[in-house]
Every structure is written in C-alpha cells, then in structure tokens.
Amino acid sequence: MKKLYTEGHRGACAYCPENTLLSYEKAIDMGVDAFEFDIWLSKDKVPVLMHDCNPKRTCGVEGCLRDMTLEEIKQLDPCYEEKFGNKFKGQVEVPTLRELLELVKAKRPDMMLGVEIKEYTEETVDIAVALLKEYGIFDRCWFYAFNGRIIRYLKEKYNARTMGYPDFQMQEFDGYDAYDEIGLCMWICKSELCEFYMAKGLPAHMFCADTAEDVQLCIDRGASLITANDPAPLLEIAKNL
C-alpha cells in the first residue's frame, strides 16, 4: 500500500486555537506528517497566518488583515473564545510565516506543510515562496488554493506541488492540468461525486476526518492524504496500515 499522509488542520485545532503556534506545536507533538495553515499578507506585506481575512471569529475584533499592519495584527488575541472560552485568552497571538518556520526548524525540521494561499495575489505567492525557500522547506510543501489562477501561477512559475479543489468550489477555474492533487471535503467523499473526481486520476487529499469511521471511509475511497481537526483517530488507524 502507498503511504497515507496524515495532516493536522490549521495545526491541531480541536485542541488549541487554530492557526496559532500552540496549535502547530500540538500537531507536531502528536506526530502528524504535515499540518495545514492559511496565509494572508498584512498591510506592510508580512505573511501572517489566519483562516479568515476578518479576525472577528477567532479574535472578537472586526477588521481586515490586509488593511492592518503587523504591529496592529500582533495586538489581536486569536484565543477563539467562542470555542475555547477563556482557556487560551492572552496566551496566543497571530503568528507570522517566519515564526512558524522557526518553530518547524526547532521542533521538526523534516515536517511537511500544507500551505493554503488565502489572498489570491501573485505577490502573496512570491513572498511566501521566497520565505519557504529561505528555510529550505519549499520542496516539502503542498500548495492549496480555491483559485485556479493562483494554482496555475504556482505551477508555472515555481513548479510547486499544487492541490486545487473541484471545479464548482473554485474561483477562476480553468482546468485540472495545473493540479498535482485534488482536495475533496467529507461531504463529497460521502457522495457519488467522489467517484467522479477520483476518476480524474489525481491523488486525493480528503478533509476533515475526525472520527474513525470517516478516516476509514477516506482510506476506502483511496485517499493519499487525510486531514483532521483532531488527528488522534487518524493517527491510530494510520499506524496500523
């Protein structure tokens, strides 16, 4: 059997606030092969890590990351109070990509990364790729985006390892030829659409499988990588494959 890669979603976000160094460190400590994170550029062109452009959901503050300087972003508290209460209040901050790469360098230099480009500009890609190459980790990255133009730019300029999504989920979709792999969410994996997209012959990343039943379904469907918010069931099954 080909290796099944295990990936933590936004770190290990079932345990710690998503896209924080605590969450990434938890994923590393749990032993996943990779973890996924989301990149935006600050107003002063620093790549920072958060899923939403508006920090309201995880930080409780309305705004737009691209309109905030790094100094302003560092004042946010991404403790995700709605999910975790006060457990992490004052203990986390919005990390930069460089801070994440320093963590990986110190804790797990061979870590693989799922790099989700959230801001659909070539500048965002260029700045992120330059930093990943500086740390010698570019060749251990998958690059994700819900935008066909960005996927194609990554492939044509950098020959990056790309993963896009089904056509109906993409912005600016222009074909699958720039995809190395395809990302299928759980509702697709559980539907007859899964067979349709698997027939395209692309290795499939399936997400997010947080129960043993969902993990096994993804394996049975032929996943090459499975992403989980809670990697524990995934890791338990993967170790016995």
For the regions a protein language model found, what residue spans apply to each?
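Phosphate-group recognition and catalysis centered on beta-loop-alpha active-site segments
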Residues: 1-241
